Design a protein with these regions (language model features):
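NTP/phosphate- and nucleic-acid-binding module
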Residues: 1-455
């Protein structure tokens, strides 16, 4: 079995598999595509949906101290002025004078193993020309509301979901009667006009965030910061991500955002190297105090036990759903020798697998199909299923392995003529067991639980 530390060439295999099997398609492909923009296909939409549901379950449903929110993508421009995004949500842009390609200066420095640009001459990676001096480029997309395109109608597409939580802090307190410490979670689209998007779905201009703002008493923030770092790392491990492919990296002081007291990234070893998967930040009381000052609305929390008003400090775990889906896809990918061929398997955790169980009649013989469809109808009410009767049973097993289906249920001639039982095949071991059709749902549930599922 090969290592899952994929080489650069193997990323091509991931992208090819993603398109061929319906995980991710290039967007607008019939018109030549549009850079770093992707559409999720039938399996990809299920994978990302399962990732989001796993996150929501762990953050909201299984906790008493976190509630949900879904705020608007377009908000008052004053929100982004108060938050600092209008003035400071920028990246350093450099341009090649000959080929006119644009790059992020900090990314070029990082590739050189440097952290500061002083005294460094940056050259174009393509033609070697000396790049321009960096200028700051605001990443927010502008648009206009209403029929008149003037300054009064200008708005921005949100670059993060967090601010929608902060401006609703008091609304949530009043509606839910929550007491500090508590959190507000949100999943939604955000938009950043990235200078150099890339690495497939890792960095795109339109992406989906899963963010939670956890409000704590000042002075207790360090303990909660440590708690959420450990909790979020464990979430990935619980979904089957290999421990050696994960690490924590604390930001150095010069890396910290203007609002942050501390920040730590959960990094994943992607084919191109270590990159941020999730960030956990101590945002202090910056956001609530800034919005109170700008809006004139009181956003301090009244602590009844202390008889004191204060702005809570905020611990923020922020994860991109697209990055999470990519990491899980890469981590699941395995190539195993199988005689003279290579067996490609996606060893997804069963709770995020797009299909949990496939029902496969041994052939398309008319006598098998009604029973196979009956078994499928019973299973699809309880699990994510797929019915497949095209091509040989061996090819169908391979196809299900390649999309990450944990279990396959095969209906054969003995099922209809002899024992009224089916064969259940395990993706990881390829072991097969015979189970009466009356017990197939329980057997599938037991099989999925044996692979780590919580069904």
């Amino acid at each position: 079995m090969t290592s899952r530390h994929l080489t650069e060439v193997d990323m091509t295999k991931i992208v090819s598999l993603a398109k061929r099997r319906g995980f991710v398609f290039p967007s607008s492909e019939i018109y030549g595509g549009i850079g770093s923009t992707w559409d999720y296909g039938p399996l990809g939409v299920e994978l990302k949906r399962n990732v989001k549901e796993a996150w929501w379950r762990s953050m909201v449903y299984e906790r008493d101290d976190v509630v949900g929110l879904d705020s608007a993508i377009i908000q008052s421009p004053e929100v982004w002025v108060a938050s600092g995004h209008a003035a400071g949500f920028t990246d350093p842009l450099v341009e090649c004078p000959t080929c006119h390609k644009r790059y992020r200066a900090d990314h070029l420095l990082e590739a050189m193993g440097l952290k500061a640009a002083e005294g460094v001459v940056l050259k174009c990676p393509d033609d070697g020309a000396v790049l321009s001096e960096p200028r700051m480029f605001n990443l927010m997309f502008e648009t206009y509301v209403g029929p008149v395109r003037d300054s009064a109608a200008k708005v921005w597409l949100r670059p993060e979901t967090a601010q929608g939580i902060f401006i609703n802090f008091d609304n949530v307190i009043v509606a839910t009667r929550k007491k500090v410490p508590f959190g507000i979670a949100q999943i939604g689209k955000s938009f950043r006009n990235e200078i150099t998007p890339g690495n497939f779905i890792f960095r795109t201009r339109e992406f989906e965030q899963m963010e939670m703002e956890f409000f704590v008493k000042p002075g207790e923030d360090d303990a909660w910061y440590d708690y959420w770092i450990k909790t979020r790392l464990q979430w990935f491990l619980d979904l089957g991500v290999r421990e050696e492919n994960l690490r924590l990296r604390a930001h150095e002081e010069q890396e910290l955002a203007h609002y942050a007291k501390g920040a730590t990234d959960v990094e994943y070893l992607f084919p191109w190297g270590w990159s941020e998967l999730e960030g956990i930040a101590n945002r202090t009381d910056f956001d609530l105090s800034a919005h109170e000052a700008a809006s004139g609305q009181k956003l301090k929390y009244f602590d009844q036990e202390l008889n004191e008003h204060y702005w809570p400090y905020v611990i923020e775990p922020a994860l991109g759903a697209d990055r999470a889906a990519l990491a899980l896809l890469v981590d699941a990918y395995e190539e195993e020798p199988d005689k003279d061929e290579v067996r490609v398997v996606l060893k997804f955790h069963p709770d995020i697998a797009p299909v949990q169980v496939a029902v496969l009649p041994l052939s398309r013989k008319a006598e098998l199909l009604p029973k196979a469809q009956e078994v499928h109808a019973a299973l699809r009410r309880q699990f994510r299923t797929q019915y497949d009767d095209a091509q040989s049973i061996g090819r169908r097993y391979r196809r299900q392995d390649e999309i990450g289906t944990p279990l396959c249920v095969t209906v054969d001639f003995e099922t209809v003529n002899a024992d009224d039982a089916v064969t259940i095949r395990n993706r990881d071991t390829m072991a097969q067991v015979r189970v009466p059709t009356a017990e197939v749902a329980d057997a599938v549930r037991e099989g999925l639980r044996g692979m780590g599922s919580r069904v």
